[in-house]
Amino acid sequence: MLEFNNSTPLTMGVELELQIVNRRDYNLTRGSDDLLQIINKTEHGYDIKPEITESMIEIATAVHTDHVEMLAELTAMRTLLVTAANKLNLGLAGGGAHPFQHWEDQRIYPTDRYRLVSELYGYLAKQFTVYGQHIHIGCASGDDAIRLTHLLARQIPHFIALSASSPFYQGVDTSFQSSRLTSINAFPLSGTMPFVSDWEAFNTYFIKMSHLGIVASMKDFYWDIRPKPEYGTVEIRVCDTPLAIETAVALGAYAQTLSKYYFAHTELEPTQDTYLTYSYNRFQACRFGLNGALINPITGTQSSIKDDILQTFELLKDVAEELGTTDAIELLRQRVLSGQSDADWLRASYEKSGSLSDAVRQQSAVWMAT
């Protein structure tokens, strides 16, 4: 049985997976161990660890109630990482996928779990060299987490479109705003959580899956959004890692604001109909970003993802003011109004220079704030 470790509602944290690149041609490089060795010479107290392949590193914030404090922590973590990277002549970058790396060149990081993943999933494990942002929102109970997971599913296309930063893959313009999520689609336990009504029903489902030998823990579910019982949170997993930490923090604040709205409006009940249009809306967000179409499964009406986001921001105005997230929502609103995503910025960088290496150089300069 899974125990849900109840946490303070609306606390939040983010995890960011970062690209490690060389400074010759800005391809990925196996630098995570060297980076960690330098970083761990200081007693920094931050959560910085390797990821599934050696050209990735993950940073995770502490638990926060205030997005401004979260930005301050991420800024300090960035300074620590950039100092270490400079000593090794390495670059660090955001972005959901490296524009021209080849998956077969990657090497699995040597931990027991990653070896098991590699043995089970074969080449998919190396293809998992993609870079995402995960957002955690605290919940008072397992029942609250199940409800919030279903309600936030409606806004998953928002998070995809707002964070989209992976237009290139293996040297090719994919025509997608976020190509990263297609790498995750291949895993058999990706997609969405089944439509269960409460924590007891979820436990029944988990126990069945465990007895069938399909899963051993919650880590085996690669769902877009899932409860995280050991943290007492709901975890949104669809975001590409943004090019800048300010965007990452704003996305966390948006999730916090949405969650506050849903917690306050207890009359809003999840409906299974949300999932009728889920895959369609998700694809539209990945392929077209802000310009994608979004079908409301309840009303049957269709709008652009851009317009739906702006309407949601308007709906959340009072909640954002109460929570103190107005500035973060405004940052995202201005991005939406400009119609420019990180993916568009990367395409423009490539068009200007004609070189994907130079585009990654600029991408790295943005994250490292150099």
From Swiss-Prot:
Transmembrane segments: none annotated. Its EC number is 6.3.2.2. GO terms for biological process: modified amino acid biosynthetic process. It catalyses: L-cysteine + L-glutamate + ATP = gamma-L-glutamyl-L-cysteine + ADP + phosphate + H(+). It comes from the Bacteria. SUPFAM superfamilies: Glutamine synthetase/guanido kinase. Keywords: ATP-binding, Ligase, Nucleotide-binding. One of its GO terms (molecular function) is glutamate-cysteine ligase activity. PANTHER family: GLUTAMATE--CYSTEINE LIGASE 2-RELATED (PTHR36510:SF1). HAMAP family: Glu_cys_ligase_2. Belongs to the glutamate--cysteine ligase type 2 family. YbdK subfamily. ATP-dependent carboxylate-amine ligase which exhibits weak glutamate--cysteine ligase activity. This is Putative glutamate--cysteine ligase 2. It comes from Herminiimonas arsenicoxydans. The lineage of its organism: Bacteria, Pseudomonadati, Pseudomonadota, Betaproteobacteria, Burkholderiales.
